[in-house]
Amino acid sequence: MTTKDTWFTEHFQATGSAIGFRVTGKLDEVQSPFQKIEIYNSTDWGKLMVIDGALMLTSRDNFIYHEMISHPALFTHTAPKCVVIIGGGDCGTLREVLKHPDIEQVTQCDIDEQVTRMAEKHFPELCTSNNDPRATLLFSDGVAYMADCPTNSVDVIIVDSTDPIGPAKGLFNRTFYESCFRALKNDGLLIQQSESPLALLELIKEMRHEMSKAGFKAFKTLPFPQPCYPTGWWSVTLSSKQPNANFAFRQTDAQTKPFDTLYYNAHLHHGVLAPPPFIAHALGE
């Protein structure tokens, strides 16, 4: 990461590429017990949240990610009531989940309280549901939380984590997925951010392999644009306990949803279920 000549630049060694944003200065910085969190102001992308030198979100395009990690799973499940979010400290995913009026309970567990406090201060638009009576915000280890989660108690688990390094490394292995499998009801769904399908298909394949070893029977990786992330393309992976799951969604409910979105809609959901051939071939779909 550099800010030379008023640019924030992040280099991606794994993809041999970089991305930069013109900034006017650093607004805030905190070193938590887990990571360094920085906030920059940019000329064209609003504010930037950077964690340990990696860009987490911008004001301009975060809605794409937050909508795609939330609504596809919630409209695929037949009647979600209880949701767990692991990670998600910026609270944008929580906001999207609580747009669904039939959701009764959401527990968000992020290891680093400072991410949420920085989001409340600099991205208040993401935190509008933090005081919703249906929401419980916990600041502790998500791996430990899922290990202690009651059996057959959750409809949808959303793993909104950083990259599989540092504090998030434990969210990408069989042991964690076994905890998720046990906590989910029989018709429950797990959805997790799964990096760039353009550059990191091997990582996605390994994730799905670990999920399979934990007991999950069916998978669907959904790609979408995310301009501020490596390669400009990102994905989430949806997993089911049911072997014959085809991930059909409640299309009528998605079409008539009683809330606004900026990216997600029923037509887009239908299209994202048909991945590009190179993804389908690599993942055996």
Swiss-Prot record:
Residues that, per the record, bind S-methyl-5'-thioadenosine: 35, 110, 141-142, 167
Chief location: cytoplasm
Catalysed reactions, as listed in the record: S-adenosyl 3-(methylsulfanyl)propylamine + putrescine = S-methyl-5'-thioadenosine + spermidine + H(+)
Binding residues annotated for spermidine, in chain numbering: 66, 90, 160-163
Listed pathway(s): Amine and polyamine biosynthesis; spermidine biosynthesis; spermidine from putrescine: step 1/1
Compartment(s): Cytoplasm
Pfam family, one: Spermine_synt_N
Transmembrane residue ranges: none
Known EC number: 2.5.1.16
Entries under NCBIfam families matching the protein: PRK00811.1, speE
Family named by the database record: Belongs to the spermidine/spermine synthase family.
Name of protein: Polyamine aminopropyltransferase
Organism listed in the record: Xylella fastidiosa (strain M12)
Gene name of the record: speE
